[in-house]
């Protein structure tokens, strides 16, 4: 819940900046696409399966992959910016998307 809410607020803050509309494509990505790519970079990890299983028992947070992909798949902006289709792994039908705050 907090990850999704925080991501929504951060995207809203990005869109409210003075330079948001003046920043065009960089390396072929829009500002919003770069925002989502930065989010994904935050959650990257190189971890063994053993350590991953250990974290499931001691860490109150979900696995990084779920913390990254869960909020993204619930955001219409993500679907729009990347043209996510029904056949894509990150696709979530609109009625199934969580909308908090």
Give the label of every model feature segment.
Residues 1-101:
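Zinc-dependent metallohydrolase catalytic domains
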């Amino acid at each position: 819940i907090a990850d999704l809410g925080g991501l929504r607020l951060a995207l809203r803050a990005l869109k409210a900046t003075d330079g948001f509309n003046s920043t065009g494509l960089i390396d072929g990505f829009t500002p919003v696409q770069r925002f989502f790519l930065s989010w994904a970079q935050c959650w990257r990890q190189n971890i063994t399966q053993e350590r991953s299983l250990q974290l499931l028992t001691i860490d109150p947070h979900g696995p990084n992959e779920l913390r990254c992909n869960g909020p993204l798949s619930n955001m219409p902006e993500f679907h729009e910016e990347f043209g996510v289709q029904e056949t894509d792994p990150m696709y979530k039908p609109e009625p199934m998307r969580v909308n908090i705050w």
